[in-house]
From Swiss-Prot:
<feature type="modified residue" description="N6-acetyllysine">
    <location>
        <position position="300"/>
    </location>
</feature>
<keyword id="KW-0645">Protease</keyword>
<keyword id="KW-0064">Aspartyl protease</keyword>
<dbReference type="InterPro" id="IPR001969">
    <property type="entry name" value="Aspartic_peptidase_AS"/>
</dbReference>
<dbReference type="InterPro" id="IPR033121">
    <property type="entry name" value="PEPTIDASE_A1"/>
</dbReference>
<feature type="modified residue" description="N6-acetyllysine">
    <location>
        <position position="126"/>
    </location>
</feature>
<feature type="topological domain" description="Cytoplasmic">
    <location>
        <begin position="479"/>
        <end position="501"/>
    </location>
</feature>
<dbReference type="GO" id="GO:0050966">
    <property type="term" value="P:detection of mechanical stimulus involved in sensory perception of pain"/>
</dbReference>
<keyword id="KW-1015">Disulfide bond</keyword>
<dbReference type="GO" id="GO:0005768">
    <property type="term" value="C:endosome"/>
</dbReference>
<comment type="similarity">
    <text>Belongs to the peptidase A1 family.</text>
</comment>
<feature type="transmembrane region" description="Helical">
    <location>
        <begin position="458"/>
        <end position="478"/>
    </location>
</feature>
<keyword id="KW-0458">Lysosome</keyword>
<dbReference type="InterPro" id="IPR001461">
    <property type="entry name" value="Aspartic_peptidase_A1"/>
</dbReference>
<keyword id="KW-0449">Lipoprotein</keyword>
<feature type="lipid moiety-binding region" description="S-palmitoyl cysteine">
    <location>
        <position position="478"/>
    </location>
</feature>
<keyword id="KW-0968">Cytoplasmic vesicle</keyword>
Length: 501
């Protein structure tokens, strides 16, 4: 029996190891729906958790509660830059890839990075310009020593963009002086040769290639003190802290390593399917972005979702400006009718073939409290779902319900119910699965790619068409010039004859 025990344990371990496949993008025509069994069909799970891996799980006490911020203004972490170290608050942004800090006086900055005071700063003698839908910044690239006091006990030399000019980038009263882009090099500015901070961290240290975020949105404050108006959270660098979530972690593949792109396969409002072509949900991409406040949806999806939310909450009438994010709605303090607003479920592609899982979002997430206009008698909210022209963006209001694991090493993103999410006694945020879903890869939007040979063929065809149009014109011009020359010769001869007479 003792000799058979190791083989028995080995066999049992093999049964729970996850299987991984490679995702391939396939260009196919739009589908009218997803095939397969109904999404309501739940499949049994063999295990709730994957085997633990050394260094990936455990306690990260020094990193817990290392994020601060204000509702709608982003979450920031304290970082030090240079020698001697200069302390700055840096916005945590999974939707960009540059590490950039204010490096010149600005009305909204209480402090800024002073390169001339750092003995370890190296100028790369290269400029960088980053425009946004609204706002922009430009600066100069360099490198310096960087560390995170409430993070891993390491110091790395990282690329830094020193922001010298900006417009509508810094936010008055936000208390952050820079931005930490945690996405991939492909979207770094000025180009993908600029190594992002997290890549430098992993290469120069023994920190595992993953991080996780717990964003704890503000429940509506009882008064307007600075402390109660703040939000907090945790950024766990290099691992997963099991104390920050409840239940199981469910993973969805990262479709492409630029933004943190995922695939949404279905959307429900209060359990009712929007019944749209699943490609519409991902047109032209779906990303997880902590630097964006709202849940942003493509135009068609936004209109369908708002129509369904309006119908579900029809017991009260709201101005059109509320649904566009232009007007607030207020109720007497403590009387917000959460029950009239529906829950929203997003189904994400699972790691296992033909399986998906769903994350359920509460109205306490997509109705964002606006503290600076509320009084002690009123609770006021802004509708935090908005229209997008650049695809679906799962912003902070979505992430605030969940513990989100950015497992870069295994190219996947995990979701579990956050231990700090806001809820009521009737409903709670949820992560549930698995559900049967077929042909999920077809839901991803593929940007049309045109290779050089195709472009050359098009160029030759266009040149031939131009030549066909130009040839008759050239013949007509030549004929006209010949006739003109003959007429001039005739006229000259006639004049000579008249003179002789």
């Amino acid at each position: 029996m003792a000799q058979a025990l190791p083989w028995l344990l080995l066999w049992m371990g093999a049964g729970v190891l996850p299987a991984h496949g490679t995702q391939h993008g396939i260009r196919l025509p739009l589908r009218s729906g997803l095939g397969g069994a109904p999404l309501g069909l739940r499949l049994p799970r063999e295990t709730d958790e994957e085997p633990e891996e050394p260094g990936r799980r455990g306690s990260f006490v020094e990193m817990v509660d290392n994020l601060r911020g204000k509702s709608g203004q982003g979450y920031y972490v304290e970082m030090t830059v240079g020698s001697p170290p200069q302390t700055l608050n840096i916005l945590v942004d999974t939707g960009s890839s540059n590490f950039a800090v204010g490096a010149a006086p600005h009305p909204f900055l209480h402090r800024y990075y002073q390169r001339q005071l750092s003995s370890t700063y190296r100028d790369l003698r290269k400029g960088v310009y980053v425009p946004y839908t609204q706002g922009k910044w430009e600066g100069e690239l360099g490198t310096d020593l960087v560390s995170i006091p409430h993070g891993p006990n390491v110091t790395v030399r990282a690329n830094i963009a020193a922001i010298t000019e900006s417009d509508k980038f810094f936010i008055n009263g936000s208390n952050w002086e820079g931005i930490l882009g945690l996405a991939y090099a492909e979207i770094a500015r000025p180009d993908d040769s600029l190594e992002p901070f997290f890549d430098s961290l992993v290469k120069q240290t023994h920190v595992p290639n993953l991080f996780s975020l717990q964003l704890c949105g503000a429940g509506f404050p009882l008064n307007q003190s600075e402390v109660l108006a703040s939000v907090g959270g945790s950024m766990i660098i290099g691992g997963i802290d099991h104390s920050l979530y409840t239940g199981s972690l469910w993973y969805t593949p990262i479709r492409r390593e630029w933004y943190y792109e995922v695939i949404i396969v279905r959307v429900e409002i209060n359990g009712q399917d929007l019944k749209m072509d699943c490609k519409e949900y991902n047109y032209d991409k779906s990303i997880v972005d902590s630097g964006t406040t709202n849940l942003r949806l493509p135009k068609k999806v936004f209109e369908a979702a708002v129509k369904s939310i309006k119908a579900a909450s029809s017991t009260e009438k709201f101005p059109d400006g509320f649904w566009l994010g232009e007007q607030l709605v207020c109720w007497q303090a403590g009387t917000t009718p959460w029950n009239i607003f529906p829950v929203i479920s997003l189904y994400l592609m699972g790691e296992v073939t033909n399986q998906s899982f769903r994350i359920t979002i509460l109205p306490q997430q997509y109705l964002r409290p606006v503290e600076d206009v509320a009084t002690s008698q009123d609770d006021c909210y802004k509708f935090a779902i908005s229209q997008s022209s650049t695809g679906t963006v799962m912003g902070a209001v979505i992430m605030e319900g969940f513990y989100v694991v950015f497992d870069r090493a295994r190219k996947r993103i995990g979701f579990a119910v956050s231990a700090c999410h806001v809820h009521d006694e009737f409903r709670t945020a949820a992560v549930e699965g698995p559900f049967v879903t077929l042909d999920m890869e077809d839901c991803g939007y593929n940007i049309p790619q045109t290779d050089e040979s195709t472009l050359m063929t098009i160029a030759y065809v266009m040149a031939a068409i131009c030549a066909l149009f130009m040839l008759p014109l050239c013949l007509m011009v030549c004929q006209w010039r010949c006739l003109r020359c003959l007429r001039q010769q005739h006229d000259d001869f006639a004049d000579d004859i008249s003179l002789l007479k």
